Amino acid sequence: MSRLGHFTGVFRVCGWGLGCSHGITYRFVNTLSGAESSPALPLKAENALLGALDMSSIEPTVYDLTAPEMEGRGRGTPGNARARAYIVSRLVNAGLAPLFEGAFGQPTFLERRGGSPYAVNVGAYLPAAKPTAGWIALVAHYDHLGVRSGSVHPGADDNAGAVAMLLALGDALGRARPPLRRHVVLLFSDAEEPPNVRTDRMGSAWFWRHPPFPLTTLHCALVFDLLAGPATPGARDAGLADVIFVLGAEASPGLARLARGVPPETSVEPLLLGLPLIEAYPFIPWRRFAQGDYHGLREQGRRPFLLVTGGRASTYHTAEDTPDTLDYAKLARVTRWVTRLLVHAAEDPRDLGWTDMVADPLADARAILRFHASTGNGSQFPWLLRRALAADRARVQALLHAWEAGAAPTAAEYRELTLIALRLQAALWHPAGWWFALW
């Protein structure tokens, strides 16, 4: 075992040319890189819920949510209101209970009596076997960019696919009605997209500040975004077409146990990553950039959560994010895996625990190398970027070799690792985008 397993010191993640006093403080752990737990056996409720799933509803739901009359579901628009009404009707038909004192909608920032809210969250839940039970929350934002520069941005992958998945799960919960240990919340948040992301104006941030249940009784939140984008040819060639990224499990052994303990689903490969790998930006080492609806929970509620995502496709935040581009077969497989995750989270008898500002460098390095295989021979990249990616891979291999041999990671090394991860994400998102993937 590396000395990391016994290391309890604190490092500041610094940027090039900047003093450590300006960096983010992470405590290095081996939560993910330590001994792995074996997948749990399927639970009775898990099999019942899987049997009640109707995968044929997912694709039509995505088409409904991206229809022209939805106008890209921009916050505060008629199209957003139509999408919200559609979601509410589905929850009513599923037989789920309204989450907000008899209502399915939660207005945010209602400035004056009779005024218009800034955004409206939608929520429903399946009651647990006992009224005094704790809660788990499954979260997917339903808003998108609306109309930008005269073009409707349909937002199929972002985030109609995840919404369709949760609605299919809601239908299954209503049909099977398994007597779970915890109440199961389905939250469809509003105002996730820019300019609201990472601000208190996010619908989910409002929800975490004004929860309909004591936040101390939240067992965990599972946040879903960008689940159905098509895999790149390199990812398919490397056997990574069904990879989904599960982020945040480094925060506690309980979360790691939960994420790793989900029984396997055909071809779905959950790749556990540390949140710092998606929250770093070049030249801004003193700030972390949250990437979704866990932001408010982390800042306000400080309860356990996982972010589950497929990552950005080339259509991300463009008018080409249309329903015909999604991989529905993959989304169906991911839905089955998420169903298993949901049941195991709802039935877990132990407190998960949660600690902020931790990182597992060994696990992150291994995950980067695993996904780096999707770059293939690099022929799709400009030569400068291809050279940088090759150098990055060699550097991660060298760091991992040193750490596995017993060297303790340093602040500068981990900052380097996060920027290597950022370059890999940027390169795979836009292979020709060398102007923002090189620094």
Describe the predicted segments one by one.
Residues 115-120, 146-252:
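Acidic/histidine-rich catalytic neighborhood of metal-dependent amide-processing enzymes
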Residues 102, 220-221, 226-357:
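Active-site-adjacent substrate-binding region
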Residues 351-430:
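Acidic, Ser/Thr-rich low-complexity intrinsically disordered segments
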Residues 57-60, 64, 78-93, 103, ...:
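Extracytoplasmic/secreted proteins, especially bacterial periplasmic and envelope-associated proteins
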Residues 70-72, 91, 114-115, 130-131, ...:
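Solvent-exposed loop/turn segments at secondary-structure junctions
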Residues 44-52, 68-78, 110-113, 148-159, ...:
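Second-shell loop/turn segments in exported
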Residues 61-64, 72-127:
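A non-catalytic alpha/beta surface segment that caps or lines the substrate-entry region
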